[in-house]
């Protein structure tokens, strides 16, 4: 049996695409193992899937000054030695890396063990982890056509992003039942990313009466961001984080407010959900979500509201516009030729398996 080691972590966006590949890889005869960080979100997600998980030391890669920048390189170095030992013992035929800071030591370790590495970059421009890892990769899968020019060494392959099959098979009635909605108002799903979004949470709750006058709300607010004062609010269902329930909640929703991470916007495209994107500002990111959102807005798939312009009036104005023109966005998304990347990436993995 062929063996693959997968890696990726830090946020759910670096983990769920790996899960999307798992059924197809198993069908193709691969035994799957996973290397991730000790305390990252990926550990709980992967172990729940019954995949053997190997934790290693990892340091966060920052673009700003922090005292931890002096100690974290030593954590990365420790992670390289740990990953090298795991890879030498497990003898995988190939490594697949989805990005996030934990992947850098794994990719370097695979290279030192002469194991081919396929990486995947979701955003238009590569993140710092993938930039550091690219020299050690055999090929780098990209999601956007615009991304090809940003990958050095002629390694880029346009594959699209992998989307979990079960996400496309949600049950609308189950989603409504889970939320306890009793009327026929349109449903607004709000996603702030796997770690939540303070600014989106705050403005939604500030305008709750106004929004609830038109919509029922499913609010995925992130860990430790539940508001106990709103637990029994009619028409408002809040969740810290969802996994198995997400397909049903997505299916039940009529509109979506979301950050603009590449994975989630491609999921919205696949599901043809009219969406309002609020990308992370450059104050708190490298600007990748701004580029992702601009690409989808240009294609007519999304309406965009800059974080700097996020106010009570602008939020309600954009929401109302999106709902009134929802069929235009659905029609535009229906014409998209973007592929689910599962098949393309699996074929590439098979091609470069030792």
From Swiss-Prot:
Cell wall formation. Catalyzes the transfer of a GlcNAc subunit on undecaprenyl-pyrophosphoryl-MurNAc-pentapeptide (lipid intermediate I) to form undecaprenyl-pyrophosphoryl-MurNAc-(pentapeptide)GlcNAc (lipid intermediate II). It holds the Pfam family Glyco_transf_28. Coiled coil: none annotated. This is UDP-N-acetylglucosamine--N-acetylmuramyl-(pentapeptide) pyrophosphoryl-undecaprenol N-acetylglucosamine transferase. It is found in: Cell membrane. GO terms for biological process: carbohydrate metabolic process; cell division; cell wall organization; lipid glycosylation; peptidoglycan biosynthetic process; regulation of cell shape. Its main location: membrane. It is an enzyme of class 2 (transferase). UDP-N-acetyl-alpha-D-glucosamine binds at residues 11-13, 164, 194, 289. One of its GO terms (molecular function) is undecaprenyldiphospho-muramoylpentapeptide beta-N-acetylglucosaminyltransferase activity. Pathway: Cell wall biogenesis; peptidoglycan biosynthesis. It is a peripheral membrane protein. Its EC number is 2.4.1.227.
């Amino acid at each position: 049996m062929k063996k693959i080691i997968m890696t990726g972590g830090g946020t759910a966006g670096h983990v769920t695409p790996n899960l999307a590949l798992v059924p197809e890889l198993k069908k193709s005869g691969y035994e799957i193992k996973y290397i991730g960080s000790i305390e990252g979100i990926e550990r709980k997600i992967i172990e729940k899937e019954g995949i053997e998980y190997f934790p290693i030391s990892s340091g966060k890669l920052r673009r700003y000054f922090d005292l931890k920048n002096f100690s974290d390189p030593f954590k990365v170095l420790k992670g390289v030695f740990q990953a090298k030992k795991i890879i030498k013992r497990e003898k995988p035929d190939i490594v697949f890396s989805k990005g996030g800071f934990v992947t850098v030591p794994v990719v370097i370790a695979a290279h030192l063990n002469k194991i081919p590495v396929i990486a995947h970059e979701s955003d238009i421009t590569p993140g710092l982890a993938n930039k550091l890892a690219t020299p050690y990769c055999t090929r780098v899968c990209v999601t956007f056509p615009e991304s090809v020019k940003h990958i050095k060494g002629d390694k880029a392959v346009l594959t699209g992003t992998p989307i979990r099959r079960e996400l496309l098979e949600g049950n609308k009635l189950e989603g409504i039942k889970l939320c306890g909605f009793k009327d026929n108002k349109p449903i607004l799903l709000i996603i702030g990313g796997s770690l939540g979004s303070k600014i989106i949470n705050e403005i939604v709750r500030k305008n709750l009466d106004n929004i609830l006058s038109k919509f029922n709300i499913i609010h995925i607010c992130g860990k430790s961001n539940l508001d106990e004062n709103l637990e029994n609010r009619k028409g408002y269902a809040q969740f810290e984080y969802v996994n198995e329930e997400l397909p049903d909640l997505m299916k039940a929703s009529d509109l979506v407010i979301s950050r603009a991470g590449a994975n989630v916007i491609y999921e919205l495209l696949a599901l043809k959900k009219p969406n309002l994107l609020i990308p992370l500002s450059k104050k708190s990111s490298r600007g990748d979500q701004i580029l992702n959102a601009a690409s989808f807005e240009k294609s007519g798939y999304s309406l965009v509201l800059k974080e700097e312009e996020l106010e009570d009036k602008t939020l309600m104005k954009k929401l109302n516009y999106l709902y009134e023109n929802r069929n235009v966005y659905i029609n535009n998304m229906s014409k998209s030729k973007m592929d689910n990347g599962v098949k393309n990436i699996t074929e590439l993995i098979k091609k470069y398996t030792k």
